[in-house]
Amino acid sequence: MLNLFVGLDIYTGLLLLLALAFVLFYEAINGFHDTANAVAAVIYTRAMQPQLAVVMAAFFNFFGVLLGGLSVAYAIVHMLPTDLLLNMGSTHGLAMVFSMLLAAIIWNLGTWFFGLPASSSHTLIGAIIGIGLTNALLTGSSVMDALNLREVTKIFSSLIVSPIVGLVIAGGLIFLLRRYWSGTKKRDRIHRIPEDRKKKKGKRKPPFWTRIALIVSAAGVAFSHGANDGQKGIGLVMLVLVGIAPAGFVVNMNASGYEITRTRDAVTNFEHYLQQHPELPQKLIAMEPPLPAASTDGTQVTEFHCHPANTFDAIARVKTMLPGNMESYEPLSVSQRSQLRRIMLCISDTSAKLAKLPGVSKEDQNLLKKLRSDMLSTIEYAPVWIIMAVALALGIGTMIGWRRVAMTIGEKIGKRGMTYAQGMAAQMTAAVSIGLASYIGMPVSTTHVLSSAVAGTMVVDGGGLQRKTVTSILMAWVFTLPAAIFLSGGLYWIALQLI
């Protein structure tokens, strides 16, 4: 691993290590901030002792990161404007990452201190938007162009819809349990709160099978949280390494000859598709703003711009850099690897835009999606040591600081305490919803999904909600995004003035 950092001066190397420490610290905060949601119900219902529940959550968080894949990781990264990603120098890259992470850390620590289940996902996304907007203002470019609106819209849709889904499904489960699993003394046990059970039976722990269901669903929430939120940390680490230590990370240096050939074949097949459908790139070119004029005085650094008009030239350059018998990326110089990454990202971006054009068949959309996946297979990756580091940070963070947010979830959302059935319904809803989102590559908020699910169970069960707590949570939700935008944007502007 250490040989990949060869070539960096001491100053840049120290800053790089500091940036990586920031990312892992952010993930640790994410662990004790968000994973409190996973253990709140299982602790409050006395299904597990707090210490054991937290260790279990840390364990399943760890394996959620390891097995969760990378689709969410790069969905977050692609929210940044493509030109900003491709043209940032090392110093600007560090300023961007430090500003983004510091803003997220400040807000997450603040909401955790007050016990508010605010969303780490919303915080991170707001920080990314703040960077994009500040970059647009400083460079004089369009604010609309500064944001990758396609990715931002898709991610915002998932963040808005997921809490509604959580509220409705969890409430629906309670309705079904009340309707079909009650009426007898034995069945009514799951609709009690721990204090009621202790008064009547002298026991505070739930019935055996109810307890098993609570533990399994809590483990599911922790695993899904790791699979979704852990990927965001992986994406941030890769963003740092690609920007600061490009020699070993801009492409997968461990890629096999087969994987490189698959990448080249995908580019060739995309070229054939464009040749068979010449009207599509023409439509796309007409929709895009013109390329910026090139500098002729030699004083301005030439920037790399993605534009559909350059697609065939870009494809030709890739085919030149990747001959058919290439077995490794080692023969390419660092500048060639960086150039290859930029070109591949641009070709992929063009492919994604083509798939969105009206008149493109479903079959062609699936073909373009498959080609994009193959093109980026050696570009969008993460070494095992990075996945392990993020998993450890999230797992360790889970075991500290969970109590504040867990008390809010378990005791302060509803006017009555949480019943066993409500805990099961909320956790099952969150585990399945977040797990599905991770599978399709959509970042969602564990906090929002589970908090909404708990609220849904309370409303349907007739217990009502504590207005003060719910108002505080909603205010935190509403202000998280603008606060993160202003924090990261302001920090980024200050950082750029100092360098």
Curated annotation (Swiss-Prot):
Classification via Pfam families: PHO4 (PF01384)
Gene (UniProt): pitB
Protein name: Low-affinity inorganic phosphate transporter PitB
Task performed by this protein: Low-affinity inorganic phosphate transporter.
Keywords carried by this UniProt record: Cell inner membrane, Cell membrane, Membrane, Phosphate transport, Symport, Transmembrane, Transmembrane helix, Transport
Membrane spanning residue stretches: 5-25, 52-72, 94-114, 124-144, 155-175, 207-227, 233-253, 382-402, 430-450, 473-493
Membrane-related topology note: Multi-pass membrane protein
Induction (UniProt): May be repressed at low inorganic phosphate levels by the pho regulon.
GO cellular component terms listed in the entry, alphabetical order: membrane; plasma membrane
Phenotype of the disrupted gene, per the record: Disruption of the gene does not affect tellurite uptake.
NCBIfam families referenced in this protein's UniProt entry, alphabetically: phos_trans_PitA
GO BP of this protein: phosphate ion transmembrane transport
GO MF annotation list: phosphate transmembrane transporter activity; symporter activity
Chief localization: membrane
Coiled-coil features, chain-numbered ranges: none
Note: The Pit system in E.coli K12 consists of two transporters, PitA and PitB, which can transport phosphate independently of each other. Both proteins may have contributed to the kinetic values and substrate specificities determined in earlier studies.
Catalytic activity reported: phosphate(in) + H(+)(in) = phosphate(out) + H(+)(out)
Similarity field: Belongs to the inorganic phosphate transporter (PiT) (TC 2.A.20) family. Pit subfamily.
Top-rank lineage group of the source organism: Bacteria
Subcellular location: Cell inner membrane
